[in-house]
Amino acid sequence: MKTQLSDRTVTFEKVAIGLILILSGLILIYLSANGPFFLNTIKYKTSFSAISQIKGQDLINLFLIAPLLFTGGLSHILNKSISKYLIILTPVYLMYYGLSMGIGMEWGSENYSGDSEKLTFHFLFLIISGLVTMMYSYSLFKPAGNIYFNKKHLMIYSIIFVVFILLFSSMWLKEVFLVMSSNYPVSYGQNPVLFWVIRYLDLGFTIPLGLLSVYLLWTRPDSAFPVQLLFYGFFMT
């Protein structure tokens, strides 16, 4: 049984999602402005190497992700057709960022001190925002009808894509096997928690999402487009 949403419900969802995206952008700006690259008022309990990575992440958040969130949220409230393409680019990133920063940037070692735990609800909001917008944005894309891809071109794309994904996976798996054999790489010694958070997220979520996107191009091309955007939105950011 197909249920038709009322105009009031549709309007409510548009405004709610738009405000969630805008608030997510504001939170990212707050975290970035107070992070180690700018004001340095947030102290993460992690290694110097990880702090250097956070500085780069702060710049990305300020000049790429936050503008995407603002533009996507505002354009969705204003009922612009481009909004769905902007909304679907950021959900995976928001969840990934919230989890890696919330969990991975604190290591219970006396060598590191900080106060990042005070930002728990900031990171939680970003994770929930990513989950909600991912589920919502997928519904914005309707099946495109009969889509045909040139089999030769699709095969070339699939091979290149899968090889790239497998090479990326092998890099993480190699380090996982090193840890399993008690031959710890430098990245593990600096922050074991962050090491596992990133590998679990990549090997358990983003890499399978990429492989699934290729599979859908072959089996369900009419509905594969939003999954492509989910993956490439994360890959781009």
Language model features with spans:
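Short, Lys/Arg-rich, polar N-terminal cytosolic tail immediately upstream
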Residues: 1-13
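Alpha-helical transmembrane segments in multipass membrane proteins, preferentially the mid-helix core
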Residues: 68-74, 133-142, 204-222
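Membrane-interface interhelical loops and short amphipathic "cap" helices
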Residues: 36-52, 104-121, 178-192
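An N-terminus-focused feature that recognizes amino-terminal "leader" regions
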Residues: 10-17, 21-63, 69, 75
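Alpha-helical transmembrane segments of multi-pass integral membrane proteins
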Residues: 20-32, 91-99, 122-141, 152-177, ...
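Central hydrophobic cores of alpha-helical transmembrane segments
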Residues: 86-94, 226-236
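A loop-to-helix transmembrane entry motif
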Residues: 53-59, 188-208
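Membrane-interface helix-loop-helix junctions at boundaries between adjacent transmembrane segments
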Residues: 72-132
